[in-house]
Protein backbone atom coordinates (compact mmCIF):
# COMPACT_ATOMS: atom_id res chain seq x y z
CA UNK A 1 0.00 0.00 0.00
CA UNK A 2 1.38 3.40 -0.98
CA UNK A 3 1.98 6.07 1.60
CA UNK A 4 -0.57 8.83 1.68
CA UNK A 5 2.10 11.46 1.06
CA UNK A 6 4.97 10.03 -0.92
CA UNK A 7 8.41 11.56 -0.81
CA UNK A 8 8.16 12.72 -4.42
CA UNK A 9 4.87 14.50 -3.68
CA UNK A 10 6.38 16.26 -0.65
CA UNK A 11 9.39 17.30 -2.72
CA UNK A 12 7.07 18.52 -5.49
CA UNK A 13 5.13 20.65 -2.99
CA UNK A 14 8.29 22.16 -1.51
CA UNK A 15 9.73 22.69 -4.99
CA UNK A 16 6.55 24.52 -6.02
CA UNK A 17 6.82 26.86 -3.03
CA UNK A 18 10.52 27.55 -3.56
CA UNK A 19 10.07 28.12 -7.30
CA UNK A 20 7.29 30.61 -6.63
CA UNK A 21 9.54 32.57 -4.27
CA UNK A 22 12.55 32.45 -6.61
CA UNK A 23 10.52 33.50 -9.67
CA UNK A 24 8.90 36.34 -7.76
CA UNK A 25 11.95 37.72 -5.93
CA UNK A 26 15.13 36.65 -7.70
CA UNK A 27 14.29 36.68 -11.41
CA UNK A 28 15.06 40.03 -13.02
CA UNK A 29 14.26 39.04 -16.63
CA UNK A 30 11.63 41.49 -17.94
CA UNK A 31 10.44 38.94 -20.52
CA UNK A 32 9.08 36.69 -17.80
CA UNK A 33 7.01 39.21 -15.86
CA UNK A 34 4.49 37.92 -13.34
CA UNK A 35 4.33 34.13 -13.32
CA UNK A 36 2.27 31.75 -11.18
CA UNK A 37 3.48 28.23 -10.44
CA UNK A 38 0.33 26.07 -10.52
CA UNK A 39 1.80 22.63 -9.99
CA UNK A 40 5.02 20.65 -10.06
CA UNK A 41 5.22 17.02 -11.15
CA UNK A 42 8.46 15.31 -10.11
CA UNK A 43 9.61 12.02 -11.66
CA UNK A 44 10.05 9.03 -9.34
CA UNK A 45 13.84 9.16 -9.59
CA UNK A 46 13.84 12.95 -8.96
CA UNK A 47 15.73 13.62 -12.18
CA UNK A 48 13.03 15.73 -13.87
CA UNK A 49 10.35 18.13 -12.72
CA UNK A 50 7.56 19.47 -14.91
CA UNK A 51 6.70 22.96 -13.69
CA UNK A 52 3.22 24.08 -14.74
CA UNK A 53 2.98 27.87 -14.94
CA UNK A 54 0.44 30.52 -15.93
CA UNK A 55 0.77 34.16 -16.90
CA UNK A 56 -1.60 37.11 -17.10
CA UNK A 57 -1.00 37.19 -20.84
CA UNK A 58 -3.49 35.47 -23.12
CA UNK A 59 -1.66 36.07 -26.40
CA UNK A 60 -0.18 32.73 -27.46
CA UNK A 61 2.94 34.33 -28.92
CA UNK A 62 3.74 36.21 -25.68
CA UNK A 63 3.04 33.11 -23.61
CA UNK A 64 5.39 31.07 -25.80
CA UNK A 65 8.11 33.73 -25.45
CA UNK A 66 7.74 33.68 -21.66
CA UNK A 67 7.95 29.89 -21.51
CA UNK A 68 11.06 29.99 -23.72
CA UNK A 69 12.60 32.61 -21.41
CA UNK A 70 11.90 30.37 -18.41
CA UNK A 71 13.40 27.37 -20.21
CA UNK A 72 16.49 29.41 -21.09
CA UNK A 73 16.89 30.39 -17.42
CA UNK A 74 16.07 26.89 -16.11
CA UNK A 75 19.67 26.16 -15.10
CA UNK A 76 19.97 29.42 -13.17
CA UNK A 77 16.57 28.89 -11.52
CA UNK A 78 17.57 25.33 -10.66
CA UNK A 79 20.76 26.54 -8.95
CA UNK A 80 18.84 29.16 -6.94
CA UNK A 81 16.27 26.60 -5.79
CA UNK A 82 19.00 24.04 -5.03
CA UNK A 83 20.55 26.55 -2.62
CA UNK A 84 17.24 26.82 -0.79
CA UNK A 85 16.45 23.08 -0.63
CA UNK A 86 18.52 20.31 0.92
CA UNK A 87 18.39 17.63 -1.76
CA UNK A 88 21.13 15.31 -2.94
CA UNK A 89 19.76 15.49 -6.49
CA UNK A 90 18.02 18.60 -7.79
CA UNK A 91 15.56 17.77 -10.61
CA UNK A 92 16.04 19.25 -14.07
CA UNK A 93 13.27 21.81 -14.59
CA UNK A 94 10.95 21.81 -17.59
CA UNK A 95 8.46 24.65 -17.79
CA UNK A 96 5.04 23.98 -19.30
CA UNK A 97 2.26 26.52 -19.83
CA UNK A 98 -0.91 25.50 -17.99
CA UNK A 99 -3.97 26.94 -19.73
CA UNK A 100 -6.48 25.41 -17.30
CA UNK A 101 -6.72 28.58 -15.20
CA UNK A 102 -7.36 30.77 -18.25
CA UNK A 103 -9.88 28.26 -19.60
CA UNK A 104 -11.61 28.10 -16.22
CA UNK A 105 -11.90 31.89 -16.10
CA UNK A 106 -13.24 31.94 -19.68
CA UNK A 107 -15.84 29.28 -18.84
CA UNK A 108 -16.84 31.13 -15.68
CA UNK A 109 -17.31 34.34 -17.67
CA UNK A 110 -19.44 32.48 -20.23
CA UNK A 111 -21.63 31.00 -17.51
CA UNK A 112 -22.02 34.41 -15.85
CA UNK A 113 -22.97 35.98 -19.18
CA UNK A 114 -25.57 33.28 -19.90
CA UNK A 115 -27.06 33.66 -16.42
CA UNK A 116 -27.33 37.44 -16.74
CA UNK A 117 -28.87 37.09 -20.23
CA UNK A 118 -31.35 34.55 -18.88
CA UNK A 119 -32.29 36.81 -15.96
CA UNK A 120 -32.79 39.73 -18.36
CA UNK A 121 -35.06 37.60 -20.56
CA UNK A 122 -37.02 36.42 -17.53
CA UNK A 123 -37.55 39.99 -16.38
CA UNK A 124 -38.58 41.03 -19.89
CA UNK A 125 -41.02 38.14 -20.25
CA UNK A 126 -42.21 38.57 -16.68
CA UNK A 127 -43.09 42.20 -17.43
CA UNK A 128 -44.90 41.18 -20.64
CA UNK A 129 -46.79 38.41 -18.83
CA UNK A 130 -47.78 40.81 -16.03
CA UNK A 131 -49.06 43.26 -18.65
CA UNK A 132 -51.09 40.47 -20.30
CA UNK A 133 -52.54 39.45 -16.93
CA UNK A 134 -53.44 43.08 -16.19
CA UNK A 135 -55.07 43.32 -19.64
CA UNK A 136 -57.04 40.11 -19.02
CA UNK A 137 -58.30 41.48 -15.69
CA UNK A 138 -59.40 44.72 -17.39
CA UNK A 139 -61.41 42.71 -19.97
CA UNK A 140 -63.02 40.66 -17.20
CA UNK A 141 -64.17 43.85 -15.48
CA UNK A 142 -66.11 44.93 -18.61
From Swiss-Prot:
Residues 118-142 are annotated as: Disordered. One of several proteins that assist in the late maturation steps of the functional core of the 30S ribosomal subunit. Associates with free 30S ribosomal subunits (but not with 30S subunits that are part of 70S ribosomes or polysomes). Required for efficient processing of 16S rRNA. May interact with the 5'-terminal helix region of 16S rRNA. SUPFAM superfamilies: Ribosome-binding factor A, RbfA (SSF89919). One of its GO terms (biological process) is maturation of SSU-rRNA. Belongs to the RbfA family. InterPro entries: KH_dom-like_a/b, RbfA, RbfA_dom_sf, Ribosome-bd_factorA_CS. The keyword Cytoplasm applies. It is found in: Cytoplasm. Keywords: Cytoplasm, Ribosome biogenesis. This is Ribosome-binding factor A. GO terms for molecular function: ribosomal small subunit binding. It holds the Pfam family RBFA. It comes from Shewanella piezotolerans (strain WP3 / JCM 13877). Monomer. Binds 30S ribosomal subunits, but not 50S ribosomal subunits or 70S ribosomes. GO terms for cellular component: cytosol. Gene3D superfamilies: 3.30.300.20.
Amino acid sequence: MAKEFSRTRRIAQQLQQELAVVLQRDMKDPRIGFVTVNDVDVSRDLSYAKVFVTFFEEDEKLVQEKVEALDAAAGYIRSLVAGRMKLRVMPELRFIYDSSLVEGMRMSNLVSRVISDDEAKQQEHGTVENAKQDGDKAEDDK
